[in-house]
Regions:
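Walker B catalytic acidic pair
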Residues: 122
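Conserved P-loop
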Residues: 15-78
Length: 289
């Protein structure tokens, strides 16, 4: 929360990105840090508090944030009709406008305003156009960007254009895990770890930007020899089935299976991708498994 303070080796960074697992303290740390920074560095300026929707922003951020600020001697007054939070402490007063970035049209709502900084809570849920418009509004000298999110897929625009270019953009990047949240008891952390599997475990618990593809059946990737039949399939006997995963715009896949009791072996397959292959082309491959 104090990376921006005098004496910090990263105080000149243009902003901060915090990603990682759920319940790791990202929202609390960044929202409080954002307000402490803005109230220490500016007075009479406009700031943006951005969430997926204004309702989720009020529910997930503002409630706890106002309590923490009040405990530190700040006065927080909210004008709900204007979607505005006014913070005061002594002679310092700043204005925090609430914005929802739920779709492409949301960028129109933030146009025109001049900002001294912006906080993006769950930025990975927002469209890129909204984030680009909001960051373009931060033209006051000394303004900074504050981002937090849970991971999505590896090709997500925020991972590629912001996390992947954090050094070029002079942004501080922090990765959070549940171990960073000292308020979570060991039983609660154990419950979360047991609650998810596959891609959801990788994203929510380990905080990794992973794709669902290839993780639907992770046990196959982890123990491939248990699922590959070595040798020839010639003369194999059993009940034969043809599986079809039909697609026109998406790939079409058909397979010839031999089922013996509880074991099913895919003998041959036909695969067609209309986006990659000529219309007249059909690929048939025999598995020597």
């Amino acid at each position: 929360m104090t990376w921006w303070c005098d004496g910090s080796p990263v105080r000149d960074a243009e902003g901060i990105i915090a990603d990682g697992s759920i319940r790791s303290g990202k929202t609390v740390s960044l929202s409080l840090g954002f307000c402490l920074w803005s109230m220490s560095r500016f007075s009479g300026q406009n700031f943006a508090l951005c969430g997926k929707t204004i309702a989720s922003l009020r529910r997930n951020v503002l409630g706890g944030l106002k309590q923490m600020l009040t405990a530190r001697g700040y006065t927080a007054a909210e004008r709900r009709g204007d979607n505005l939070l006014i913070l005061r402490r002594g002679s310092v007063e700043n204005y925090y406008y609430l914005f929802g970035g739920k779709d492409e049209a949301s960028q129109d709502l933030i146009q025109g305003i001049t900002l001294a900084g912006a906080l993006f809570d769950e930025v990975a849920l927002m469209p890129e156009s909204f984030v680009n418009q909001a960051t373009a509004r931060c033209s006051v000298a000394g303004s900074k960007f504050w981002f937090n999110c849970n991971p999505e897929g590896p090709e997500h625009w925020f991972r590629k254009n912001w996390i992947g270019r954090a050094s070029d953009k002079r942004l501080l990047y922090l990765h959070f895990t549940m171990e960073d949240n000292l308020s979570l008891t060991p039983p609660i952390k154990a419950r979360y770890r047991a609650q998810y599997t596959g891609v959801f475990y990788e994203r929510y618990i380990r905080g990794r930007w992973v794709a669902a593809q290839g993780l639907v059946y992770p046990f196959v990737a982890e123990h491939p020899d248990s699922y590959i039949l070595r040798g020839t399939t010639a003369g194999m006997d059993g009940a034969f089935y043809i599986s079809i995963d039909y697609g026109t715009h998406n790939p079409c896949s058909m397979g010839l299976w031999c089922v013996q009791r509880t074991v099913a072996v895919r003998l041959k397959e036909s695969y067609y991708d209309s986006r990659a292959l000529p219309v007249s082309y059909t690929h048939l491959r025999a598995h020597e498994t």
